[in-house]
């Protein structure tokens, strides 16, 4: 079987077979024509045409192919070019080109013309101006050094000879000729500062607006227009501070240049410096000159201050500096002049605008008057001038603008824009002058103090009309009362304002109008009320007097003004909070309702009313800040300052007490909650209404009622109701809680003592809530604590208001002993019993079998799974599991189940004789899942696939010659025991040996006698097994 004849085998390629490309027909493109030429002309060399010299020259047009010679392969062995006619010399031919020939190698006429034009322009520039390549040379170096540089660069002195530079040294106001300096190299400017000219104005014209407009610098530009003087340039000189100073320097000018000179503060100061005094004054000096508003607009610095300084006074700050405290003081001190409006205008910068415009009076300089604090005061001192109403008009700033509108006097707008501090201080301190004092406080405390001081000055109504900004307004008050105005402007903090009233004067409502800022607006309208200066109190007593009247701002205004009442201030302690203090003063003054409505600031407004009326309701409405307003004012109780705390919390404290009780500051400390604490302490007065309304703000409104009423409801309730009702606020706002308590309840945070004692600071510190409790211990008064929750906190240590959008009123129990935490616990425990019962029923039903539930009769008989299983003894040993029931493999069976079978002796011999063969044949089947893919090949690409052999791609190819010479495969009978035994049988019988046995022995080289049965190998194995058996038996 293994024999294969050579003729049967295929022949290898390369011997007798032709290449494969010869067998393949050519492409149709190369198909031959009838005359044995290929169709594709470019490839067929028989169609090539050889032309004579000059035929490829198309400069004179296309030549006729008359002289062309067509050469074909069948006609010539080599291409022959026959030149008919005389041949000219190549050099002479080039010279014979006609003019009409197109010269494509030369430049076009436009190119040389353009080049000549460029060269001419460069020549003109260099001849006219040697420094054309250095346009900034005149600006970058001083005149002296410039002259030295021009000597080598301009030897011919073409630059106006030395007169241009000498004139520059003599006067910087003389401009150079425009023709001499086309590029503006030499600008006659001082080497260090950019000068802005201030145009003067006629003598009887009001001073034009002072409007600084540098976009990136804190330099404010003052543009006064005095009649006969030239205003000097503006010089910026703030070396270390971003403070811009405006300093007019001409000797006889009304408004001189704005000079920036911040000495120690980052506050921009406006200094007007008359020649005779070292004090900077901001005042038009002509008697009949009106001063327009001063507008500063440094975008990057929010600290604009207009400061008119006396010789020994500190610089006044018109802008609240600290980012966290926005306390600005405006202190006008004219003897008989009313304060004009202070109008803030810069949207992004705290630029204050001061525009004095008295027609017949000279505006006195603004003076700083810091008595005990480092507060600068701006004191205008125009004599015999009435102050028109202050009208703020800032569109988007929380700046308090006071806008005067008197017929003869106009004061420039003063605008402060503290970004994150909403406390502004206005202090009027002239003896007989109605002035506004803007005084910034320390940066860490946003306490604003307003102290009215003029005794005999009448001030017209202050009207606020800022559409989008909360502008604080001042209200005129009686001559002997210091009516102060506190305007907080921090967007994140709720500032409360306190406004004292005259003893017997009825004050009209205060009406704020800011839409987007929590700026308080004071709009007083009494005919015979004098507006006292806004003065910052000493640092020890953080008492601020405020008279807020904004209807839309959440600023709380208190207006007590008793003629003989002492004022005490509640001073909160948090350092980083802009807190305003409210000081009640009227002993017999009735406070009218004050509805604050600041959209973004929790500023509460208290509006006092007729003198004999008790404290009426106070209604704050800030939408986003949790500022609470409390206004209880018994007839003979003193009002204490209301101070909001840290900027993040709009917490305001208002604590009225009996006439002889001094209450110290109440410092709440909720870090991020707008919790306001209100502690009324009149001897017989209960807590008045507390009404939280804004859906998104934790602003609570307190409506105090007459002194004989107990606690009234949060939403309007009867005045005799003893229990105060708490209206749940929205879930995202901190709701203030009003909880009246007896005089001896347990006080969590504040515990005011009896009369004639000063209440010390009690700091509420609930662990997880920012709600503090103020519990006064007066003999009979009801103490109510106003608690505002954090905007997103539901758990309040004392009281918790949850449902924001529900109209129901949940009353808080006024029991003295229990706190709000216990109430919450009780509320939780009320629903606990029913809830637990429901849970137990559901659990019991869940664990009941479905089948048993289907048979209700079985359940009625008390039959369940446990009763049935108890009837049978189920032990863990008999418990059926999945492990016992599943089918097992043979290797998983126990050893006891396994058994073995032994072979007999003959079978062992046979088995061992074939042992080696079995080892080679029996192999584990490869795992098809884990087998890796192997790329196979079938030989070289140029070989026929039939001639190739299947091989791995990474194995070397097999030579075809070796395939032809491969050895014969071994016969299957070679290694078998059967053929040998059959041979022995044939020999024993004498039969003819079959051919297959003959070929086997011939192939193996065996002889019939050499190989016999039994096979020698098998015999040796059998003998070995017998020896081992005998030895084992002997042992």
Curated annotation (Swiss-Prot):
Disulfide bonds: none
Feature: compositional bias, Pro residues: 380-392
Pfam families reported for this sequence: FAM47
UniProt region (Disordered), positions on chain: 1-21, 159-797
Biased composition annotated in UniProt, kind: Basic and acidic residues: 159-173, 478-490, 611-622, 683-694, 753-766
Record field: compositional bias (Polar residues): 533-544
Signal peptide: none
InterPro entries from the UniProt entry: FAM47 (IPR032743)
Family as reported in the entry's similarity comment: Belongs to the FAM47 family.
Xref: PANTHER family: PROTEIN FAM47B, PROTEIN FAM47C-RELATED
Protein name stated in the entry: Putative protein FAM47C
Organism: Homo sapiens
Gene name of the record: FAM47C
């Amino acid at each position: 079987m293994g024999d294969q004849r050579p003729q049967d085998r295929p022949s290898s390629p390369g011997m007798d077979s032709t290449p494969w490309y010869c067998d393949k027909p050519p492409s149709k493109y190369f198909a031959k024509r009838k005359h044995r030429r290929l169709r594709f002309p470019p490839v067929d060399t028989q169609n090539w045409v050889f032309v004579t010299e000059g035929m490829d020259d198309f400069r004179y047009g296309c030549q006729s192919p008359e002289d062309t010679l067509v050469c074909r392969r069948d006609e010539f062995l080599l291409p022959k070019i026959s030149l008919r006619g005389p041949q000219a010399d190549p050099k002479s031919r080039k010279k014979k080109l006609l003019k009409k020939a197109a010269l494509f190698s030369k430049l076009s006429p436009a190119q040389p013309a353009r080049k000549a034009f460029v060269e001419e322009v460069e020549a003109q520039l260099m001849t006219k101006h040697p420094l054309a390549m250095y346009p900034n040379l005149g600006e970058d170096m001083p005149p002296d050094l410039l002259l030295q540089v021009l000597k080598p660069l301009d030897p011919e002195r073409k630059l106006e000879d030395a007169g241009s530079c000498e004139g520059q040294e003599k006067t910087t106001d003389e401009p150079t000729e425009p023709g001499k300096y086309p590029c503006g190299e030499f600008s006659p400017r001082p080497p260090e500062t950019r000068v802005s000219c201030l145009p003067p104005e006629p003598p009887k014209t009001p001073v034009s607006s002072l409007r600084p407009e540098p976009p990136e610098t804190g330099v404010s530009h003052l543009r006064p227009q005095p009649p006969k003087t030239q205003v000097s340039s503006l010089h910026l000189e703030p070396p270390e501070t971003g403070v811009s100073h405006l300093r007019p320097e001409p000797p006889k000018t009304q408004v001189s240049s704005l000079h920036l000179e911040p000495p120690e503060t980052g506050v921009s100061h406006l200094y007007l410096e008359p020649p005779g005094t070292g004090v900077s004054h901001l005042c038009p000096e002509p008697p009949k000159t009106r001063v327009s508003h001063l507008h500063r607009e440094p975008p990057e610095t929010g600290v604009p201050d207009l400061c008119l300084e006396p010789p020994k006074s500190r610089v006044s700050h018109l802008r609240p500096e600290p980012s966290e405290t926005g306390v600005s003081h405006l202190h006008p001190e004219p003897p008989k002049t009313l304060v004009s409006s202070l109008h803030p205008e810069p949207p992004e910068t705290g630029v204050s605008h001061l525009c004095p415009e008295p027609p017949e009076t000279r505006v006195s300089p603004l003076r700083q008057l810091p008595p005990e604090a480092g507060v600068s005061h701006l004191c205008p001192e125009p004599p015999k001038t009435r102050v028109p109403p202050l009208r703020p008009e800032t569109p988007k700033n929380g700046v308090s603008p006071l806008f005067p509108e008197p017929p003869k006097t106009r004061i420039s707008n003063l605008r402060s824009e503290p970004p994150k501090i909403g406390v502004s201080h206005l202090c009027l301190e002239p003896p007989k002058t109605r002035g506004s004092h803007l005084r910034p406080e320390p940066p860490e405390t946003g306490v604003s103090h307003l102290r009215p001081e003029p005794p005999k000055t009448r001030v017209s109504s202050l009207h606020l009309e800022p559409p989008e900004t909360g502008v604080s307004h001042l209200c005129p008050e009686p001559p002997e009362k210091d009516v102060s105005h506190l305007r907080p402007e921090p967007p994140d903090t709720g500032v409360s304002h306190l406004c004292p009233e005259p003893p017997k004067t009825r004050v009209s409502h205060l009406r704020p109008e800011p839409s987007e800022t929590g700026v308080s607006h004071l709009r007083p309208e009494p005919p015979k009320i004098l507006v006292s200066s806004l003065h910052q109190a000493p640092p020890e007593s953080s008492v601020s007097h405020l008279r807020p009247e904004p209807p839309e701002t959440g600023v709380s205004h208190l207006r007590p003004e008793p003629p003989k009442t002492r004022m005490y201030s509640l001073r909160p302690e948090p350092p980083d909070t802009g807190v305003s203090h409210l000081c009640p003063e009227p002993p017999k003054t009735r406070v009218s309702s004050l509805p604050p409505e600041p959209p973004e600031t929790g500023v509460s407004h208290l509006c006092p009313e007729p003198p004999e009326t008790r404290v009426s309701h106070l209604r704050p409405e800030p939408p986003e800040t949790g500022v609470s307003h409390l206004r209880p004012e018994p007839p003979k109780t003193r009002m204490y300052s209301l101070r909001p705390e840290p900027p993040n919390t709009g917490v305001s404290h208002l604590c009225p007490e009996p006439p002889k009780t001094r209450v110290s500051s109440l410092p709440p400390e909720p870090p991020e909650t707008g919790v306001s604490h209100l502690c009324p302490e009149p001897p017989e007065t209960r807590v008045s209404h507390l009404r939280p309304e804004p859906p998104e703000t934790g602003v609570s409104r307190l409506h105090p009622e007459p002194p004989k009423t107990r606690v009234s409801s949060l939403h309007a309730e009867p005045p005799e109701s003893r229990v105060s009702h708490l209206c749940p606020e929205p879930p995202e706002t901190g709701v203030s809680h009003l909880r009246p308590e007896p005089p001896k309840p347990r006080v969590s945070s504040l515990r005011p003592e009896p009369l004639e004692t000063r209440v010390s600071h009690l700091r509420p510190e609930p662990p997880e809530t920012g709600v503090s409790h103020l519990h006064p211990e007066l003999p009979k008064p009801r103490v109510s604590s106003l608690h505002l929750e954090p905007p997103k906190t539901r758990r309040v240590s004392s009281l918790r208001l949850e449902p924001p959008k529900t109209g129901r009123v949940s009353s808080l129990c006024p029991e003295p002993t229990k706190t709000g935490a216990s109430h919450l616990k009780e509320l939780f425990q009320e629903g606990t019993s029913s809830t637990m019962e429901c849970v137990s029923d559901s659990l019991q039903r869940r664990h009941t079998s479905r089948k048993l539930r289907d048979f209700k009769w079985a359940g009625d008989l008390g039959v369940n799974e446990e009763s049935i299983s108890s009837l049978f003894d189920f032990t863990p040993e008999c418990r059926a599991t999945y492990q016992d029931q599943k089918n097992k493999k043979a290797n998983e069976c126990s050893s006891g189940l396994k058994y073995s079978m032994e072979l007999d002796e003959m079978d062992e011999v046979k088995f061992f004789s074939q042992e080696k063969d079995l080892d080679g044949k029996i192999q584990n089947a490869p795992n098809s899942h884990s087998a890796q893919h192997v790329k196979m090949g079938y030989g070289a690409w140029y070989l026929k696939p039939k001639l190739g052999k299947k091989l791995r791609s990474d194995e070397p190819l097999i030579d075809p010659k070796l395939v032809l010479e491969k050895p014969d495969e071994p016969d299957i009978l070679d290694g078998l025991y059967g053929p040998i035994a059959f041979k022995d049988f044939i020999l024993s019988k004498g039969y003819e040996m079959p051919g297959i046995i003959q070929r086997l022995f011939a192939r193996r080289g065996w002889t019939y006698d050499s190989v016999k049965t039994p096979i020698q190998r098998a015999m040796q194995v059998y003998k070995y097994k017998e020896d081992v058996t005998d030895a084992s038996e002997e042992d």
